[in-house]
A protein has these predicted regions:
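Short aromatic-glycine motifs in intrinsically disordered, low-complexity regions
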Residues: 39-46, 71
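Hydrophobic pocket/interface hotspot
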Residues: 15-19, 25, 41, 55, ...
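Beta-strand/loop substructures that line and gate deep hydrophobic ligand-binding cavities in soluble
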Residues: 71-124, 128-131
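Intrinsic-disorder/low-complexity, polar/charged segments enriched in Ser/Thr/Lys/Arg/Asp/Glu/Gln
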Residues: 1-5, 40, 50, 78-80, ...
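Short, solvent-exposed secondary-structure boundary/capping segments
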Residues: 62-70
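Hydrophobic/aromatic beta-strand elements that line small-molecule binding cavities or substrate pockets
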Residues: 6, 51-57, 69, 79-87
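A short, structured loop/turn motif at beta-sheet edges
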Residues: 12-13, 56-62, 85-94
Length: 131
């Protein structure tokens, strides 16, 4: 299992407004567009195809999101991820992002993708905080 965490110098609600809006993709590198239909988001990756992810759980009160890849241009057997935000203080929160993937040979690819997305998420949240 892959696991990342990051403490944001931003209110929990501000970070949730980005990651909890499941069709918002400005923080996901390589994704040009997202279409959300009946709990399934389709991510368009120019030059790579489309990825479909089923939103399994989105808990607005506990700031928790769980999703599973159901269609991918790479031959995945299983991919599920969880994002949890916890309040550290009124103006700080911690994001914990965990993911499982099979076959395990794709783990390094997923780790690189998640690292890039986390870096972009930090940039987006910081830009919104400075508005």
């Amino acid at each position: 299992m892959l696991s990342f965490s990051h403490v944001f110098d931003a209110p929990l609600e501000q970070v949730w407004s980005v990651v909890g809006t499941v069709d918002r993709v400005d923080w996901v590198p390589g994704v040009a567009a997202c279409d959300l239909q009946a709990g399934v988001r389709t991510l368009n990756l120019p030059g790579a195809g489309e990825i479909q992810e089923r939103i399994i759980e989105r808990d607005e009160e506990n700031y928790f999101l769980r999703y599973q890849c159901i269609e991918s241009p790479i031959p995945l057997e299983f991919h599920e991820a969880r994002m949890q935000l916890t309040r550290e203080s009124p103006n700080q929160c911690c994001l914990t992002w965990e993911a499982e993937i099979q076959p395990a040979s794709f783990e390094s690819f997923l780790q690189e993708s998640m690292s890039g997305a986390l870096a972009q998420l930090i940039t987006v949240v910081e830009a919104e905080a400075s508005k």
